[in-house]
Amino acid sequence: MNNFEKKIVITGSAGFIGFHLSKMLLESGAEVLGIDCLSNYYDVNLKNARTKILKDFNSFKFLKLDLVNEVDTLNSEVESFSPDGIFHLAAQAGVRHSINVPEAYLSNNIVATFNILELSRKIKIKHLIIASTSSVYGANTDMPFNEEQAT
């Protein structure tokens, strides 16, 4: 996977999947703009350590950014980066937490995704990948899960 000369935006770049995807793409020759708000739902020290590793790559730029409340900065930074694709991995995790603090989910999952969709439309992004969670399958008993099942 060498010479992957693409410019990729990864939201949630300090999370587990975002970090490993960023690292793999950087090692493959991509330029990566990592975006994360570094929320304290998971260990911020771990997120900072992951981001520090990514910053060792010359082709990595990091933005500590809230996808809901800093939309103008998001739009201008991503537009000037001129990406070939976006991996939208940022989200508020935790099913139990969604019951206790539903506003966080509405804001961080729905509004943030809407902002990424609008940005993608505006700059005519060629490739947009939005990650989800197995939680969307709910109490489904059919295994393995597949994309045809009700969510």
Question: PLM features: what roles do these ranges have?
Answer:
Residues 1-151:
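N-terminal Rossmann-like NAD(P)+-binding domain of SDR-like oxidoreductases, especially those catalyzing
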